[in-house]
Amino acid sequence: MNKIKHAIFDLDNTLWDFRKNAKLALAELYVKHDVASRYNFSFDEFHPHYHESNENLWALIRDKRITKEELRERRFREAFDNLGIFNHELADIFEHEYMETITNFNEVVDGAIELLDYLKPKYTLHIITNGFIEVSKRKLESSDLTPYFDTITYADELQILKPDPRIYEFAMEKSGAKKEESIYIGDDWIADAVGAKAFGMKAIFFDR
């Protein structure tokens, strides 16, 4: 049996708390643009619509049915449309400012730092993320996660997303790791757990 030498992580919602940080960023924009008083919908009414739209569109990206550019065009428009707010100019402003605002928040998943501190002396650590490259870099820097990792593989480098086996192959070549000596940890059943196992790696599904 091969000894595990490399631990490879997903980023969003595995280490960096996307759900919490996204909600904080959106709440800030909601107040900034006075949406509640202009349209008589509270943030708590808006947020589930955004979350559902974003999750559904990322699933379509994973299944190669839409592009990331289409996600950025659609997610806020759909969220506002579902509330009867047909203001696409406002939706587009939210999209632009959201991508800038979200990295002002740097909450990590509970226990993530303690886990990385424990693993770092024992294993070589890496990341593979499907997230937007420039935003992901800012997330890692603002949350002080970067120093833990020897390599970080961004899907945007290849224009290929997990669970496509080519992104795992690219990460192996980049890191010099062997899949038989690696384990992958992530919160997305299809992109992370199924994708890594199909490639031939051991995988841990982080079910939050």
Language model region names:
Residues 1-2, 121-123, 174-181:
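Glycine-rich phosphate-binding loop signature in dinucleotide/nucleotide-binding domains
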Residues 163-174:
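Short loop-to-alpha-helix "cap/lid" segments that border enzyme active sites
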Residues 179, 183-208:
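Acidic, Mg2+-coordinating phosphoryl-transfer loop and its flanking beta/alpha structural elements
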Residues 93-107, 112-143, 149-155, 161:
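Substrate-recognition element of Asp-dependent hydrolases with the DxDx(T/V) motif
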